[in-house]
Amino acid sequence: MSAVKNAEGTQKLSVFKMTWPIFIEILLQMMVGNVDQFMLSHYSQHSVAAVGNANQIINIVILALSVISMAATILIAQHRGAGNREKVAEVCTVALLANMVFGVIISAALFIFDGFFLSLLDVPSDIWAEASLFLRYIGLFIVVQSAYISFISFFRGYSLLKITMITSVVMNLINIAGNCILIHGLGPIPSLGVLGVTISTNTSKVLGLLLILYFFHKFIDIRLSLKYLRPFPKSTLYKILYLGLPSGGESLSYQISQMVIMRFVNVMGIVVITTKIYAYIIAMFSYIYSQALAMATQIIVGFLIGAGDLDAVEQRVWKTIRIAVTISTTVTLLLFFNSDSIYGIFTDNPEVLELGRHIFLIEVFLEAGRAVNMVMVMSLQAAGDIKWPVTTGLVSMWSVATLGAWFFGLHLGWGLVGVWLAMCLDECLRALVFIYRWKSEGWRKNNLLE
């Protein structure tokens, strides 16, 4: 009965109160990468293209690290809903260990084999050196990022979302200050360009990790301990991987498909490359609040399922979808009607401005589908319904988005407009499939706590 009461209390919490700190946190996390490119845009367009290409690989790595962390957040929320504090501590310990091991391996791979990864993108020779520099030295600090992402997931599972927001604010301020000094130089400090970006970005990550460790010991009432690893809790690791690998596969598949699409774009010339990169940065403002809504809903869904209140889950998910679609569509329309002014922040190139207008007309429909997908995927994950998101994602992302980008963009010669049309069709098709799955109520049959 106490679990049900706890669930009712959680349901009464304003989703807005959970969403806005997540929104600010995600915005600032994305800005760590995008601020780099914005500030570099006043230094060199080639540097923007170099960092944009390297970030395609970094984004895949971050998503791979988020696989375990996302699963940890769901399990923490469910065990909290069921009132099992010891299991929460065990999940946190196992998740951190797994992510740290993975982080060390990835850091070494990116530093040593940077050339191999860049060749997969067919990076142009005139931006290769800067892309390699950025990938190697940002990659070297991925192990720091893996620990940071793990602790962020613990705070989300505990619904302590303002803490993660504060940490992101501090990290972003450090990164911006470092860029201001190091990109163009200041006084005796020379202009370092892309190297300066890597220094300020990595410094902000290290200090961010130290801050989140302090907050963990101050605000969370569990302690990580080796006792939870003796004997090793294979069942807990299995549940983390059961949730994380397929769920992460959906996101990972998306990023890999985007990497292939970037390869198509790279043969279209520097104007198209920079337009795509700027469009991605601007598009972030269309979907970021919907992503925050989806993440807040995932935490609530996990808690409610742990408490056994499935009817409340149903109501919460549909309400979130309506809000997410409305907000994403409204913001994208505003961006479309003001596209010249917004692109003008980055460049005055008339070719980029014209191409950007065409892209954002398609973006209106793309973002409506993406809003549905984000809420549905995270809700299905929280319910333990893992196979549908990853299967649908794999099929649609590759057969519609990637193949379509080649067909419309290169084969028919529609360029970046054709690429965006294919990605729009992918998002809308997946949205319809996920709506069908949720209405079938197959998600109600899963139980991760047994």
Which residues are covered by each model-predicted region?
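Transmembrane alpha-helix boundary and packing residues in multipass membrane permease domains
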Residues: 22, 26, 37-38, 74, ...
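Helix-terminus/linker motif at the lipid-water interface of multi-pass membrane proteins
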Residues: 27, 31-49, 118-125, 181-192, ...
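Short runs within selected transmembrane alpha-helices of multi-pass transporters and secretion channels
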Residues: 69, 138-157, 164-172, 197-212, ...
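Alpha-helical transmembrane segments and their lipid-water interface positions
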Residues: 29, 33-36, 40, 62-69, ...
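Short alpha-helical transmembrane segments in multi-pass integral membrane proteins
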Residues: 1-22, 76-143, 189-245, 301-366, ...
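Transmembrane helical elements of multi-pass membrane transporters/channels
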Residues: 17-36, 137, 171, 204-208, ...
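Interfacial/gating helices of multi-pass transporter permease domains
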Residues: 40-59, 126-130, 194-196, 236-243, ...
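Small-residue-rich hydrophobic transmembrane alpha-helices
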Residues: 48-108, 145-159, 163-164, 262, ...
